[in-house]
From Swiss-Prot:
Gene Ontology terms: biological process: phenylalanyl-tRNA aminoacylation
Lineage of source species: Bacteria, Bacillati, Bacillota, Bacilli, Lactobacillales
Catalytic activity: tRNA(Phe) + L-phenylalanine + ATP = L-phenylalanyl-tRNA(Phe) + AMP + diphosphate + H(+)
CDD domains per record: PheRS_alpha_core (cd00496)
SUPFAM superfamilies: Class II aaRS and biotin synthetases, tRNA-binding arm
Domain of life: Bacteria
Organism: Streptococcus pyogenes serotype M1
Protein name (database record): Phenylalanine--tRNA ligase alpha subunit
Cofactors, names only: Mg(2+)
Length: 347
């Protein structure tokens, strides 16, 4: 077969092969281009035969070679566009959306477990005749410490690592300042004061499984005539039973808080083992739940309340601790990390 016939055959076969390549043959198209037009391709091999032609025939065949090269080059370019378009169309078809189908329902949010816990506790106190009082998170040193019987040089201030903004302004370490402000304004001629102050508090703790630089407290205060330790115990027993069940009992242990005298730590009988001893109660049968005590006379006197005529009790508990005990949560950081897998457990 002469060179011209070989060129025509190469052109015909190449064009036929190109027509068969679709969107799924991108690699085959590239391989064919290299096999025909590459440095070692079929057309290049045919060009080597030009040197064997006569002087009259060489220009004619050379022109034919250039025409075939130009034709095939354009054919490859056009087919490449067709292959790419087919590939894109196949992807669009595979990912097509039926716009007539109903859309996905929006995911409904729900209250955070700490919000749920706080509202449950507040409902208990409202049912017992307490009022809910909010206060400032940024507080004066005077109300946060001095009004709680903690003067400037009191060593017990070291019990609460504090975030100071200025020498006299700080992030409150407890919600007790709300009690002091409310005590200043209360009219005892209209009856005793019964209040709780929920809110966020701040301490310079290193965050770990059981500590956080911010957490939530609910502190309670009752002041009136003839308020006794028995009233405190009865109130706490009712609160604990409503939160953890009627079968629970409490135990009071002597403790120290500058703003109460006497002061106690309150334990609740273990709700997991019933007091027999387990990993939750550390084999003691009891779980420490909150601190409480009778309001120190100095705290009353600083609010202009006659400590000889009036007495009271105070207590404080943490929402995180209550939630961790109720739901078996072992890491306080889960409340603040925004992990939806954690939050959805309490939906």
């Amino acid at each position: 077969m002469d060179l011209q016939a070989q060129l025509e055959e190469l052109k015909t076969k190449t064009l036929e092969t190109l027509q068969s390549l679709t969107g799924n043959h991108t690699k085959e198209l590239q391989d064919l281009r290299v096999a025909v037009l590459g440095k070692k391709g079929s057309l290049t091999e045919l060009l080597k035969g030009l040197k064997d032609l006569s002087n009259d025939l060489r220009p004619v065949v050379g022109k034919q070679v250039n025409e075939v090269r130009d034709l095939l080059t354009k054919a490859f370019e056009e087919q490449a566009k067709i292959v790419e378009a087919a590939k894109i169309q196949a992807q669009l078809d595979a990912e097509s959306i039926d716009v007539t189908l109903p859309g996905r329902q929006m995911t409904l949010g729900h209250r955070h477990v700490l919000t749920q816990t706080s509202e449950e506790i507040e409902d208990i106190f409202l049912g017992m005749g307490f009022q809910i009082v909010d206060g400032f998170e940024v507080e004066k040193d005077y109300y946060n410490f001095e009004r709680m019987n903690l003067p400037k040089d009191h060593p017990a201030r070291d019990m609460q690592d504090t975030f100071y903004i200025t020498e006299e302004i700080l992030l409150r370490t407890h919600t007790s300042p709300v009690q002091a402000r409310t005590l200043d304004q209360h009219d005892f001629s209209k009856g005793p004061l019964k209040m709780v102050s929920p809110g966020r508090v701040f301490r310079r703790d290193t965050d770990d499984a059981t500590h956080s630089h911010q957490f939530h407290q609910i502190e309670g205060l009752v002041v009136g005539k003839n308020i006794s330790m028995g009233d405190l115990k009865g109130t706490l027993e009712m609160i604990i039973k409503k939160m953890f069940g009627d079968e629970r009992s409490i135990r009071l242990r002597p403790s120290y808080f500058p703003f109460t005298e006497p002061s106690v730590e309150v334990d609740v009988s273990c709700f997991k083992c019933g007091g027999k001893g387990c990993n939750v109660c550390k084999k003691t049968g009891w779980i420490e739940i909150l601190g409480a005590g009778m309001v120190h006379p100095s705290v009353l006197e600083m609010s202009g309340v006659d400590a000889k005529e009036y007495s009271g009790f105070a207590f404080g508990l943490g929402q995180e601790r209550i939630a961790m005990l109720r739901y078996g949560i072992n890491d306080i950081r889960g409340f603040y990390q925004g992990d939806q897998r954690f939050s959805e457990q309490f939906n």
